[in-house]
Amino acid sequence: FVGERTGQIIALYDSDKNGEADYKKVIAKDLQLSSGISIFNGDLYFSEVSKIWKIQNIESWLNDNISNSDLPKKVLVTDELPSDTWHGWKWLKHDEQGELYFNVGAPCNICLSENSQYASILRINDAGWHHVAKGVRNSVGFDFHPVTKKLFFTDNGRDWMGDDTPSCELNRVDINGQFFGYPYKHATNVKDP
């Protein structure tokens, strides 16, 4: 499954299991900044700038509908995310318990926002959303360590302080809600002017 800049989610279907896609099928369209994709218990989750959706039993649906132009039913997971497109791409990942993790980038290069969702990595479950990491300018990827299960994530450094300053980061979350410095400090010890 692939999120395209054209606002579509595409299923690449390998019917003969040779590692190459035999068919390409649009399964969602007219999305804004379609990006993050995660599969859990057979359901496909995907994001756009202010929403997260799921399609239930995606593999079964594809097997029954690969040759027609129908679109599967999308189920809204949340539409309570900021709509700013600056750092608006959302990346998704489920943990082993099925809780969905996603990023919300800062809506600017350097700023403070009253909306606590910005500049963070969040987790959503039946009880709502919760902070996993704060002070994260813009993560473009994260995953869980296979043994420790700790979350590791990237964070893109701020702009306009120099060619290579501050560095982008690879961080580890040790406690929920941990603060990683943005907008005050970058790359461990670079203070914001």
Task: Identify the meaning behind each predicted range.
Residues I39-G42, H94-Q97, F144-T148:
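Residue-level detector of Asp-centered blade-edge/turn motifs that repeat once per structural unit
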